Amino acid sequence: MVHNFVNYQVISLSITASIWAIKVLFPCTLVLGIIVLFLRWYVRKRSKNALPDLRFVPRTRQDIRPVVVGFFHPYCNAGGGGERVLWTGIRALQNRYKFVRCVVYTGDSCVSGDEILRKARQRFNISLPEPVEFVFLKRRRWVEASTYPYFTLLGQSIGSVLLGWEALTSYLPDVFVDTMGYAFTLPLFRYLGGCQVGCYVHYPTISTDMLTRVGSKKTSYNNASLISNSQILSTMKLVYYYLFAITYGLAGSCAQVVMVNSTWTYRHILSLWKRKEQTSIVYPPCDTNAFIELPINIGKIGERGGDNDKEDSADCIHSIVSVGQFRPEKDHPLQLRSFHQFLKCKMAKDRHKYKLILVGSCRNKEDQDRVKSLRQLAFDLEIESCVEFALNVSFEQLKKNLAKATIGLHTMWNEHFGIGVVECMASGCIVLAHDSGGPKMDIVVEWDGNPTGFLANDEKSYAAAMETIFALSPEEKSVICHNARQSVTRFSETAFENGFLQCTEPLFISV
């Protein structure tokens, strides 16, 4: 009897809870649905008369309905690897589909569309077969890190929603592709715009590695010592990161097609977005042709000679070249300290035969200040005479530096891919890269069963690898260099275009 009474009470409570849930959830769902429908109507009304030429169909081609693809790339005039992905992807779509019209949402309002396309031709040698329209966004500052000195991830993400709303209400495409990693624009265009949605992710906005580093209280460029030395602040930041990661995962899960640039990015995006069936690795296009043309002249005086070479004369310089912007995450101090560790094992009379050349661009005062501090570090380590800073060099000068170098050096922890590493391999350098991220998982891997370079993770291992490389015979160096050069065909523009077209095809089937 008591047992039946308890069961009755439980059933009654369950029914009551269900009724209250229906009473609360149904009106909320109804209101949310009405809001979404209203915003969809508002978006279509706002962008109805924008760029009418994109929807124009000639009388002779009434059988073709144009499909407009919008690319969200607020910094499309930057001239970096992300922009090469953008323009190569657009060219691939235009060559494949004659009915495709392309729009680029950009914040580069200080230049014209013609100037942007001209720079793409000059920088990447990419000419588009069809015209491209530009929607110039006025509020790009909302996604700039400098706008948010604190809670930068949160600020930039909210800013990307606002910038995405400006893009959405300026012009509504049929297909939306984010090529810069602004995941919070994806639900906007899918649910409020009714678009087919895809994205190309260069690196996750937040990763499990970032969570681990904060949890272990390690100091880094994005985890200040003030926080890492405080248990309370570290816990607060960890909670903030976890909440942000959940929100980021929900936004990313709205994508119907996800392309990532490396195995490292793939694993992190998969753990956050949970879209395994929709996610594919498409290596970014690397222009290796100009570097492959450089001869592999192992054994010439001053050009990739080794400690075992007969030309080890007073005027023979064995150079190590590092290529990368002077940003904190590139970890140039590790390069200097590793080089110092390597030189300590050399006789004083032989140290002048080795040179570390840091090639990179100085974009602003922050970069200049970092270079100044690096010069000071080289002075403090007493290696300033063996270190050269090549700032803002021309492409021709870059090729000359790589042509003479024995080692191509890379020290960034968990770099998502590593185009600079690919360029060093293509040029004939022996690569010494960080044992993490894209270089470890995708680039400096065995090719046809043979090594393509070396990996290290701290001063001691970098110095030891430098010693090993310089001690190789010319024949051993030649085998590694030729093998590495053959392996970079995986990262060609043709390989990227094929992968990009295969991944984006479902977006056009559903339009």
Residue ranges of model-derived segments:
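A charged, aromatic-enriched C-terminal amphipathic alpha-helix characteristic of glycosyltransferases
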Residues: 457, 471-511
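Aromatic "clamp/platform" in nucleotide-sugar-dependent glycosyltransferases that forms part
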Residues: 413
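Membrane-proximal helix-turn-helix segments that form the acceptor-binding/catalytic region
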Residues: 165-166, 205, 217, 221-258, ...
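A conserved mid-protein helix/loop that constitutes part of the nucleotide-sugar donor-binding site
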Residues: 80-88, 318, 325-347, 369-372
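Short alpha-helical donor nucleotide-sugar binding micro-motif in glycosyltransferases
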Residues: 392, 400-405
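Nucleotide-activated donor-binding/catalytic signature segment of Leloir-type glycosyltransferases, i.e.
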Residues: 125-128, 368-396
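Conserved donor-binding/catalytic core segment of Leloir-type glycosyltransferases
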Residues: 71, 259, 299-330, 336-341, ...
